[in-house]
Regions:
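N-terminal accessory regions of nucleic-acid-interacting proteins
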Residues: 1-37, 42-44
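Metal-dependent phosphoesterase core characteristic of DEDDh/y 3'-5' exonuclease domains
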Residues: 23-25, 30, 48-53, 59-91, ...
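Flexible, glycine- and charge-enriched loops at secondary-structure boundaries
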Residues: 46, 101-104, 205
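Metal-dependent phosphoesterase signature
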Residues: 90-118
């Protein structure tokens, strides 16, 4: 972990939160765009490519501690259009939710339009330290670096460039636990992380929009506890 942090510092992809007083950040970062995709999945680890079936993003204003906007869309899978029973039971997403939903190509265009408007309204930028005022947040880096990246590659779709500026909150949470001698080998999920800090998961686990909202609650708690090291991927 320290080697990774040192390398992140060397290339300038490192965010250092030294203070978080009176709900005010001391550097430029203010807006956190938190996403959590849900994808097709199959029982018994059947090797089929994952396709996004829910695409949610919420915006956290870290100064006020509130969610100020959101984007959410179901997505129609095209490679394996029939949801497995396992997938529906896990996520609560039914075949009827995705049957008439737009494809990923259409959802990405809608998302880019929403993101452009959000950046204009908030006056925020993802350009990178030290000018960045916004960053994407995920619970594990799977959502962007594996799920979205692989599907965009297979379907020859452009990956939203702003998503390259992001942080993996699970890695940061593990680092924080390590600093409190709980250990960096902790392997719990989002619900477990919330329980560890005395919060309860609100909504349904494995529903993307609920996962994103709960990730924002965990992030806000970490900010309030002066968690220092935020490294981008």
């Amino acid at each position: 972990m320290q080697k990774t942090i040192n390398e992140a510092k060397r290339i300038g992809a490192f965010y250092d939160f030294n203070t978080f007083a009176q709900n005010s950040l001391t550097n430029n970062l203010r807006w956190f765009f938190i996403l959590d995709f849900e994808s097709t999945c199959f029982e018994d680890d059947i090797k089929k490519p994952a396709e996004i079936i829910e695409f949610p993003v919420v915006i956290l204003d870290s100064v006020t501690g509130t969610l100020i906007d959101s984007f959410q869309s179901f997505v129609k899978p095209t490679e394996n259009p029939e949801l497995s029973v396992f997938c529906s039971n896990l996520t609560g997403i039914q075949q009827c939710d995705v049957e008439n939903a737009p494809t990923l190509a259409v959802v990405l265009r809608k998302f880019e339009h929403w993101l452009r408007k959000a950046k204009e309204n908030l006056g925020c930028s993802f350009k990178g330290q030290p000018t960045s005022t916004a960053i994407f947040v995920t619970w594990t880096d799977w959502d962007i670096s594996t799920c979205l990246w692989d599907e965009c590659r297979r379907k020859k779709l452009p990956l939203p460039g702003d998503m390259l500026n992001r942080i993996d909150l699970k890695a940061i949470f593990q680092q924080w636990l390590g600093s409190h001698k709980i250990g960096q080998k902790w392997r719990g999920g989002l619900k477990d992380a919330l329980n560890l800090i005395g919060l309860h998961f609100e909504g349904r686990p494995h529903r993307g929009i609920d996962d994103a909202r709960n990730t924002s609650r965990l992030l806000l708690h970490l900010l309030s506890k002066n968690v220092l090291n935020f490294a981008t991927s």
